[in-house]
Design a protein with these regions (language model features):
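Active-site helix of classical SDR
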Residues: 5
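Conserved beta-strand segments of alpha/beta enzyme cores
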Residues: 19-21, 51, 84, 112-114, ...
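Mid/C-terminal beta-alpha module of Rossmann-like enzyme folds, strongest
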Residues: 69, 76-124
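Conserved C-terminal active-site "lid" loop/helix of NAD(P)H-dependent oxidoreductases
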Residues: 85, 95-97, 101, 117-156, ...
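Glycine-rich Rossmann NAD(P)(H)-binding loop
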Residues: 52-57, 86-93, 141
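Residues that recognize and position ribonucleotide moieties
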Residues: 21, 50, 59, 92, ...
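Amphipathic alpha-helical segments that line or abut small-molecule/effector binding pockets
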Residues: 64-75, 150, 154
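NAD(P)-dependent short-chain dehydrogenase/reductase
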Residues: 11-58, 64-65, 71-72
Length: 162
């Protein structure tokens, strides 16, 4: 089951103490390492066309935005008053297909990308169809301004191209 080990980790933490902060995130990418953004850029250069899942909806999260949030969280004078599970991802929603189209367009590439359904691309773990996170607790607790995913994607692709 997708996410089972993550849930087990959260349960272990909550069972061990009542003073904790867990940050859940989704669809994480950056200019470093292996991730969806870098994979799409590479595949656009290697393949004549791409087929990308269009029926799974979530929110891409730029690792630099997550890191900035965590740094602000740690520096919060009232950190001790905040415990629990917090959701952090960029603002907005997208399908993997929407995300891939944006990556291609921002990078100035022209590879044709076609939408497919999940069943057409089997994976070992079944991913959720809708994984958009509610960030109300993060916003209410810390007043953090969360960038829109496409704006952050532009920043990331600019860094990759440097």
């Amino acid at each position: 089951v997708y996410g089972a080990s993550k849930l087990a980790g959260e349960r272990a933490i909550t069972a061990a103490t009542n003073r904790f902060i867990v940050i859940r995130t989704s669809w994480l990418y950056s200019s470093f390492g292996a991730n969806f953004v870098k994979t799409i850029l590479r595949l656009c250069a290697e393949k004549p066309l791409l087929n990308i899942i269009a029926d799974q909806i979530g929110t891409p999260t730029y690792a630099a935005d997550l890191a900035q949030f965590i740094a602000q969280l740690i520096m919060n004078d009232n950190l001790q008053a905040h415990t629990g599970i917090y959701h952090f991802s960029n603002e907005g929603v997208a399908s993997w297909y929407d995300f891939a189209i944006s990556i291609r367009d921002i990078a100035g590439l022209e590879t044709p990308i076609f939408p497919i359904e999940t069943f057409q691309y089997p994976t070992p773990a079944t991913r959720p169809r809708f994984s958009v996170m509610n960030k109300k607790k993060v916003k209410d607790s810390f007043g953090f301004s969360i960038p829109y995913w496409r704006d952050s994607l532009e920043v990331c692709i600019k860094k990759i191209k440097q």
